[in-house]
């Protein structure tokens, strides 16, 4: 195995920024060493990296990039969290495995938040954003933690900031696992509001609480249950339907036909987390089958490698996917066996 050694110097030398980069007790450096299988020795702002060439190159790029992220904002040095190390490593590994680098959607959506600039982390995420830009209707289908909803909200905020649209509308069906809305206190909007919290959280992170509140008061941003969409035509709007796996076929059709002139719609969902009553087909599953060949509609499918949460989440997703695949094979085998027995009895 080829071993490479590279030395880098991070400028300007700043002990406070270096401390933020390395983390308490050098935890961030240790995570880089453990995850990339390399050795890192540091003396002040000089780093010596030893390991496989591709991993050394990735580590050097990560250190330089994260050191830039420590630059003071409003006089305060920015801390580097373990999650940022994980995301940076994940991004580097994607670039190693792909023949070409991730498309630079960061130039198209360049939104500064408390957590930095929002940009795609995987090729699937980059393609998803590109499709949102190029299509009137975009579907994002995949497990939790793949950035489907977050990136859609980022694209909506960017379109609003660029004045390409006049309003953002966020919605989701009023269905949740194990809970009946009729038994919850309050009117429909009060009952559904907690289920829209992920959408609120993304908006607050990107725009700040006060600005979001003002935009909601002016109806520039509307967060509402799917039931409120009936009978409306939405022009000059960016519309996001979250948790769409819990729509019925009729609800999905109703939503898609609300889209007016100069509007975009993004529909996100996870077909493995359907909470509809038994024997009720998901509107998302049906749309994937019916609309696959319709122009101006894009379908994007995410997988465990697109998960950008804690590393264990990707492993959990893989485990469930493996179980579901085995269960489908088992059911198919049972059905085939029953059919064979019926034929023999005849």
Swiss-Prot record:
ATP binds at residues 142-149. It is found in: Cytoplasm. InterPro entries: P-loop_NTPase, PhoH, PhoH2-like. GO terms for molecular function: ATP binding. Its main location: cytoplasm. It comes from the Bacteria. Pfam families: PhoH. Keywords: ATP-binding, Cytoplasm, Nucleotide-binding. One of its GO terms (cellular component) is cytosol. PANTHER family: PHOH-LIKE PROTEIN, PROTEIN PHOH. Belongs to the PhoH family. This is PhoH-like protein. It comes from Escherichia coli (strain K12).
């Amino acid at each position: 195995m080829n071993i490479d050694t590279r030395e880098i110097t991070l400028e300007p030398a700043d002990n406070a920024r270096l401390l933020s980069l390395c983390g308490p007790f050098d935890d961030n450096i240790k995570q880089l060493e453990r995850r990339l299988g390399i050795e890192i020795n540091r003396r002040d702002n000089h780093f010596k990296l030893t390991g496989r060439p591709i991993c050394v190159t990735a580590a050097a790029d990560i250190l330089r990039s994260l050191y830039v992220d420590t630059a003071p904002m409003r006089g305060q040095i920015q801390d580097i969290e373990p999650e940022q190390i994980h995301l940076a490593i994940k991004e580097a590994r994607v670039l190693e495995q792909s023949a070409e680098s991730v498309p630079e959607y960061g130039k198209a959506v360049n939104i500064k938040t408390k957590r930095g600039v929002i940009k795609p982390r995987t090729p699937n995420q980059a393609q998803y954003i590109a499709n949102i830009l190029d299509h009137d209707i975009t579907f994002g289908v995949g497990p939790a933690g793949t950035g489907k909803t977050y990136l859609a909200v980022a694209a909506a905020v960017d379109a609003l900031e660029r004045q390409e649209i006049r309003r953002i509308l966020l919605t989701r069906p009023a269905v949740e696992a194990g809970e009946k809305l009729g038994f919850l206190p309050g009117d429909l909007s009060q009952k559904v509001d907690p289920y829209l919290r992920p959408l609120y959280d993304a908006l607050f992170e990107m725009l700040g609480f006060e600005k979001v509140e003002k935009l909601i008061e002016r109806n520039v941003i509307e967060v509402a249950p799917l039931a409120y969409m009936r009978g409306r035509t939405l022009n000059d709007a960016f519309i996001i339907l979250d948790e769409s796996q819990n729509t019925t076929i009729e609800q999905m059709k109703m939503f898609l036909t609300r889209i007016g002139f100069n509007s975009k719609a993004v529909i996100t969902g996870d077909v493995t987390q359907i909470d509809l009553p038994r024997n009720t087909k998901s509107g998302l599953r049906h749309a994937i089958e019916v609309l696959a060949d319709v122009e101006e509609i894009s379908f994007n499918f995410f997988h465990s490698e697109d998960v950008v949460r804690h590393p264990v989440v990707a492993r959990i997703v893989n485990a469930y996917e493996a179980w579901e695949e085995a269960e489908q094979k088992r059911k198919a085998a049972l059905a085939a066996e029953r059919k064979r027995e019926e034929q023999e009895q005849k």
